[in-house]
Swiss-Prot record:
Residues holding Zn(2+): 202, 217, 220, 223
Reaction equations catalysed: 7-carboxy-7-deazaguanine + NH4(+) + ATP = 7-cyano-7-deazaguanine + ADP + phosphate + H2O + H(+)
Keyword flag Metal-binding: yes
Annotated cofactor note: Binds 1 zinc ion per subunit.
Molecular functions per Gene Ontology: ATP binding; ligase activity, forming carbon-nitrogen bonds; zinc ion binding
Cofactor(s) essential for the protein: Zn(2+)
Gene encoding the protein: queC
Family named by the database record: Belongs to the QueC family.
Domain of life, per lineage: Bacteria
Alphabetical GO biological process terms: queuosine biosynthetic process
PANTHER family: 7-CYANO-7-DEAZAGUANINE SYNTHASE
Species for this entry: Rhodopseudomonas palustris (strain BisA53)
Pathway entry: Purine metabolism; 7-cyano-7-deazaguanine biosynthesis
Protein name per UniProt: 7-cyano-7-deazaguanine synthase
Length: 242
């Protein structure tokens, strides 16, 4: 007999970055109970996990109904991922493009592992929806962010656990400007400001340099995508207001 999953409960993959913070707000707008899960896998930008507490505290001030919906925050340590991944996210090496056309920040299998662990936790807690911030519009080309990958994994998870999880990727077809716009739609300028100030995207874990779009080195692929999206979003917002 399969586990009973509650369709009004969601588990959000919440790293503390811009995308996952936006997905968390999206989930709070749609589900009755929302829990979060983050992963410590020896990443260089571990400061990202530290951002989660400030984001959660800030989200609770935006809408009264979100306070009651927010459930437990889970953190899983999976150091073995770093042990099998010789990448710029888990090693102190310069970020560069590889011969395969992927940046050396690609951690093979990372999202596959994250979603599988998330599903195992959701199964135990009776949570029917799993939400991730994967996107194949503005992204670095990671194959485990693609829609086809996530759908195939979702089918495998449901077969392997004899369940019917719903895997949601609300950012899949949004560029970074549209992701900023979604945050504005969900929580207004206060949510945009919260994500800008307290979410962390930079692969190098840089929190000393402040930019219009938030904190980061400004040079790594993640910072460049975030900055480009912010410029486009700001221009669109100014045009509407002007």
């Amino acid at each position: 007999m399969s586990q009973i999953l509650h369709p009004d409960a969601a588990l959000v993959l919440f790293s503390g970055g811009q995308d996952s913070a936006t997905c968390l707000a999206w989930a709070l707008d749609r589900f009755a109970r929302v829990e979060t899960i983050g992963f410590d896998y020896g990443q260089r930008h571990l400061v990202e996990l530290d951002s989660r507490a400030k984001l959660l505290d800030g989200l609770k001030t935006l809408k009264p109904e979100w306070v009651a919906k927010l459930g437990e925050t889970h953190t899983l340590a999976i150091p073995t991922l770093a042990q099998v991944s010789d990448t710029a996210l888990t090693r102190d090496v310069a970020i560069a493009m590889g011969a395969d056309g992927l940046p050396n920040t690609f951690v093979p299998g990372r999202n596959l592992i994250f979603l599988t662990f998330a599903a195992a936790l959701a199964y135990r807690r009776g949570i029917g929806a799993i939400i991730g911030g994967m996107c194949e519009t503005d992204y670095s080309g990671y194959p485990d962010c693609r829609d086809a990958t996530i759908k195939a994994l979702g089918e495998a998870i449901n077969l392997g656990m004899a369940t019917q999880f719903e895997l949601h990727t609300p950012l899949m077809w949004l560029d970074k400007a549209a992701t900023w716009g979604l945050a504005q739609t969900l929580g207004g300028e206060r949510l945009v400001d919260l994500i800008r100030e307290h979410s962390h995207t930079c692969y190098l874990g840089e929190r000393g340099a402040r930019h219009d779009w938030g904190f980061g080195c400004g040079e790594c692929p993640a910072c460049q995508l975030r900055a480009k999206g912010w410029r486009e979003f700001s221009a669109q917002r100014d045009a509407r207001q002007g």
